Amino acid sequence: MKFIYLFKKESTLQNCINELKLKNPGKEIKIHCYFDFRVNGEDKKTTFCLLKLESNIEIPYETFEILNRKQFEKKFNGLENKLEIKNIPSTSSSPSSSQLFLTLPATSQSSQPKSTNSSTESSSIGQFKNQVDENEINLNKNKIDEFQKDVISLQQKVSSLFQQYNKENEKNKTLNQIFDIQNKIQKMQQQIHFIQNNQESFITLFINYKVKIGSAFIIYIFYNVLFFIIVRFNSFFFF
């Protein structure tokens, strides 16, 4: 079984549990060992909270400091001198004489800690509260409401961006259609110019052909007349 070790300054155990529950709604949080160190035993003057949890939950990294096994043991060794804790907790899932094993069900707000070392509890471990402070509950509800409002606002922004994106797509489609039509018009104009040029060439050729035919016809008539005159002239001299 893998564990995760958390450390948080200026926080109570209950606050840490509330934050973990808020990050893991509907999940069961198993705490294998916790050390809620308080100055002079007063609940309002908590110095730090040290937790050993199963690693199947999500951690709010912005508020907790994540420790490795050596860092956890180092901090625990510091507590050993101050609080007369004899044994360092092992990584096994079964609770030992120095471990406090408690389970926080997802359906309940609090749970009673189980421990076989009452002297350790009285000297180093703060009492686990049965009821969550109402102010903290209200604060969490306000945070949830704010998050929900932010989510709704972001969803509206996303919807607006999608609409804008669709409009841009429609604009692009329209522009593409316009470009296609312009290309077709240009091709048709080129065909028209080609036909006009061919027509002008044909007309010029036809005119030249008509001129040549007319000239040939005139020459033909001229030679016929000349031939007729010659024939008549020869017959006149013959008689």
Swiss-Prot record:
Transmembrane domains' residue ranges: 211-231
Parts forming coiled coils: 134-202
A cellular component term, taken from the record's GO annotations: membrane
Positions with biased composition (Low complexity): 107-127
Main location per the UniProt record: membrane
Region (Disordered): 104-127
Bilayer topology: Single-pass membrane protein
Keywords: Coiled coil, Membrane, Transmembrane, Transmembrane helix
Keyword flag Mitochondrion: no
Subcellular location: Membrane
Protein's name according to its UniProt entry: Putative uncharacterized transmembrane protein DDB_G0281105
Source organism per UniProt: Dictyostelium discoideum (Social amoeba)
